[in-house]
């Protein structure tokens, strides 16, 4: 089974840049001037156009085609039973651009896109799932606080999506989350400083990943009495060209995997890259190095840790990770206590738990 990510890219990811198609399919407020920006963030992907009838028509045709083709009973073309709508929409200026737009307005349109995809997909497969895509910025923080109409806190998007879905008729949207470490360059998420264990945490990374299912388990978020599902559809542990950071990444993966296994509403945990990517903003997120000819290189330590999960060798890997990270920290993060509330702010703006 495959979960697909639906993207609306004007110039990347194989776009043929058909002017007639783009005139209706690209969001009317897309920041064309930021496609190759050297001064500020780059607009890689457009939001889906929910503002015109023509835009919605192209979008529905796109989703209908994929849903019909990839949910056939004979699985002739394979199976695709879930759609992630756009990418990291709380950082919309880069990954789902609709220009300058307050979070409430952006999320209203985004919820429409999720709803249309849900309607189209459910016609062909009753168990199809639709996912909202979020990065690790959660509450009262975002990628660039000076640009509040371009970058949002993930929790605000989730809360507005609930508001609009209840207003217009509830449906079972879910969340595709990216719990990267707080600094993507450093693989040791277990040493993250920003994540806390309340609903008001600034970030949700693997360190406090338990907060996300706890937040969605609140009664107001339930759909027909059941919590919304979560997939961890993108994450990775950067290596810096040295043995120590590679070992950090391997041990981090082991702990992350143990934490996620304990969370019933998380259905999938998939890595961002199998092989290091030269164009990944300086990050090396693969399980393997990359050769000079761009073929897969030597496996990193994380490769062997992943290989040993859910095998008799897993217990030894857990022992290694516990010793490397520190038994007290490892055990505390494996069984954290979540405070179901906002936390108590102190004078520095941090939270006391």
Please annotate each region the language model reported.
Residues 1-144, 182-183, 276-281:
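Substrate-binding cleft and catalytic face of glycoside hydrolase catalytic domains
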Residues 13, 59-62, 67, 73, ...:
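Noncatalytic carbohydrate-binding groove/subsite architecture in carbohydrate-active enzymes
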Residues 34-36, 41-43, 94, 239-353:
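Aromatic-rich peripheral "rim/lid" segments of glycoside hydrolase catalytic domains that contact
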Residues 42-43, 98-101, 191-196, 286-288:
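Short glycine/proline- and charge-enriched loop/turn segments
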Residues 52, 101-102, 153-154, 208, ...:
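Helix N-terminus capping/helix-initiation residues
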Residues 52-56, 202, 206, 296:
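Short, solvent-exposed loop/helix junctions and linker helices
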Residues 80-86, 225-233, 262-277:
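Extracellular serine-dependent O-acyl
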